Regions:
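Regulatory nucleotide-sensing modules
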Residues: 1-46
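Charged/polar, solvent-exposed surface patches and flexible loops
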Residues: 6-9, 92, 110
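Basic side chains
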Residues: 11-14, 70, 111-113
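Short hydrophobic/aromatic patches on the structural cores and recognition surfaces of FHA
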Residues: 19, 39, 56, 74, ...
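Histidine kinase transmitter module recognition
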Residues: 25, 42, 93-100, 111
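Cyclic-nucleotide recognition modules
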Residues: 52-105
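Polybasic "coupling" helices that flank or enter modular domains
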Residues: 106-118
C-alpha cells in the first residue's frame, strides 16, 4: 500500500464514475501512474480480469516505466478518486523514498509472476 497522504499533497486528483474507463489497453497516453485514493478499479487484459485495486493500491506503472502502450484496461468499478503521478514525480519518489521504490518493485514482481503462472 502506498502512503496516499504523502503523495496527495502535491499531486493531481481526478474523479471517475463507476464504469468509466481510466485508460484502455493499447493507449499510448502513458504519462501517469495512478494511486487509488477511494473506490475500486478493475484491471483487465483482453477482457480477462486481472486484478481489483483497492484504496492505497496503484496501477498504470508499467507503461510509465517502459514508455510502451498500456498493457491492460483500467475501469472504475465504483465511483473513485485517483491521484495522478507523472514521470517526473514518479522518478522523484523512487529516488527519494526507498520504501516507495520497494513497493513498486514488489507489485511489479507479483503482477509478472501472476501473469506467467496462468
Amino acid at each position: 500500500m502506498v502512503n496516499v497522504d504523502a503523495i496527495k499533497r502535491e499531486r493531481n486528483t481526478k474523479k471517475y464514475q463507476a464504469g468509466e474507463i481510466i485508460f484502455a489497453e493499447g493507449d499510448t497516453d502513458n504519462d501517469y501512474l495512478f494511486v487509488l485514493e477511494s473506490g475500486q478499479v478493475e484491471i483487465a487484459n483482453r477482457k480477462r480480469f486481472l486484478e481489483l485495486i483497492e484504496p492505497g493500491g496503484f496501477f498504470g506503472e508499467m507503461a510509465l516505466v517502459n514508455d510502451k502502450p498500456r498493457s491492460a484496461t483500467a475501469t472504475a468499478k465504483t465511483d473513485c478518486v485517483v491521484i495522478q503521478v507523472n514521470h517526473g514525480d514518479f522518478y522523484f519518489l523512487v529516488q527519494h523514498s526507498p520504501h516507495f521504490a520497494i513497493q513498486v518493485m514488489q507489485v511489479l514482481s507479483e503482477r509478472v509472476r501472476r501473469n506467467t503462472d496462468t
